């Protein structure tokens, strides 16, 4: 097993797929997105890395896809189970695509949503509404312990509000207004958000590969 780590015992029985995240918001969101997409895979069959006691690898990739693969490879090796990971972020046009892969730690401390939002809005304080274009991007990766890998990508294009609005979601959801709507992602219901989100797109595209892996239809890599 890669890195000489012992395989995690994990929760008993029904676990068939592990998600490479310690963010419970993401675990719930990804369970909802995959619900019904994989025959025989219920919520109890999907657990997050934190529930297995897995540590987070260093994300030193240069793209969302590279970081998603880093996380999925590490968790597949640790757990001995198929692993799914995503790497996502906000890409702002006038910032040349930043924060991008640094979205979660834009203000310096990883996962400080309030600080990240405050810094971003301060940086855009003098930017007119017509120049506040942005998009969420998500790369979703599936990796099996025997080396099979598959990556899909999704995008949600919109513009940035002047101030945060809404109480749903997480991250930059309170400031991204999807094209064709007047509400921020944080003002959408979870169902509405998952139907259009970058993460929803990427994981729905990944679902057929997950089905194939869990049903034994994907041959071992190499």
What would you call each of these model-derived segments?
Residues 2-18, 24-222:
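Anionic-ligand binding patches
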């Amino acid at each position: 097993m890669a890195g000489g780590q012992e395989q995690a015992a994990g929760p008993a029985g029904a676990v068939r797929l592990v998600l490479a995240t310690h963010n419970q918001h993401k675990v719930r969101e990804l369970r909802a997105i995959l619900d019904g997409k994989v025959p025989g895979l219920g919520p109890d069959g999907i657990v997050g890395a934190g529930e297995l006691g897995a540590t987070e690898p260093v994300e030193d990739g240069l793209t969302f896809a590279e970081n998603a693969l880093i996380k999925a490879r590490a968790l597949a090796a640790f757990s001995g189970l198929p692993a799914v990971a995503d790497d996502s972020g906000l890409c702002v046009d006038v910032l040349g695509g930043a924060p991008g892969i640094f979205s979660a730690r834009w203000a310096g401390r990883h996962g400080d949503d309030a600080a990240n939002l405050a810094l971003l809005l301060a940086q855009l304080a003098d930017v007119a509404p017509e120049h506040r274009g942005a998009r969420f991007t998500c790369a979703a990766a599936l990796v099996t312990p025997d080396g099979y890998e598959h990556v899909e990508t999704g995008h949600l294009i919109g513009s940035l509000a002047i101030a945060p609005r809404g109480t749903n979601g997480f991250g930059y959801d309170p400031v991204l207004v999807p094209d064709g709507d007047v509400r921020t992602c944080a003002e959408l219901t979870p169902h509405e958000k998952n139907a259009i989100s970058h993460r929803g797109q990427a994981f729905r595209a990944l679902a057929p590969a997950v089905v194939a892996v869990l049903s034994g239809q994907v041959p071992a890599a190499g």
